[in-house]
Amino acid sequence: GGGTGDTDIFYALVKLILAKLYDEQNTADNEEYKFQIFSYSDDKNDLEDPDAAYDRINNLYREALTSMLNTPKEKAQQLYVVDQEKMGLSKIIYAIQTLEEYSFIEGRRSYDGTDLLGDFFESIIRDGFKQTKGQFFTHTNIVKFIIYALQVDNLSIEKINNENKLPYFIDPSAGSGTFLIELMKIVTKTIKIKQKDNLKQNNNIRNFYNDNFMPDDNENKWANQFIYGIENNFDLGTAIKVNMILNGDGNANIFSGDGKGDGLLPFENYIKKNGV
């Protein structure tokens, strides 16, 4: 609200969610979450110092960047979860208090398996963000058409049966992550449901299936090895990672732009082995 633009609000929300996701994934069962505003009594107005809360959430965000987005620690230390010049501290504290009441890991799916948070987040990107940013993301229906036209589902079955692995998928301009998310959903559904009967029955394939698609609450483990996304826009790269997690995956390799603008943070040198 106020003088804060829609794009700034969107990125602030993304970064706060990333910090909360990291906190939920890494906090021990016997420890309290750091992503919250602590109270010293039953009085809701008796809250901790806002600056101390901001510093703690900011540290969470920086840890999330290095752990989940492959950001070098030196660069992460220079970044802030929310720019206080664009959004006042009182608004940041209010946002944290609102988000702390929800679990983004446990509460992700509905009873019928629908990724409610993922669908909600994608709708924000598709219907709101693009209009203010001037970026146009490919509609989900077109993405699905392209994936099926490329016969990614059949190729996945063929690769597992013949080579005991999946195809490698890379989106060099990942945008909001829609291609990667739909690839992930389609491949997982193909292997586990639609074409499961087409998998060969032998120990190697059973082991590959169990290692990469089981248990059901972590059925996208395979993405860690086979899905890659690159996005030069650092903030949008962060949004992709959040989008992937909210749609059921925290494993995909997402690389966002660095100072060189190449979007490939871990790589310094490239060796061309052949012309293929």
What are these model-derived regions, one by one?
Residues T7-L16, I93, T114, G118, ...:
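Non-catalytic, well-ordered alpha-helical scaffold segments
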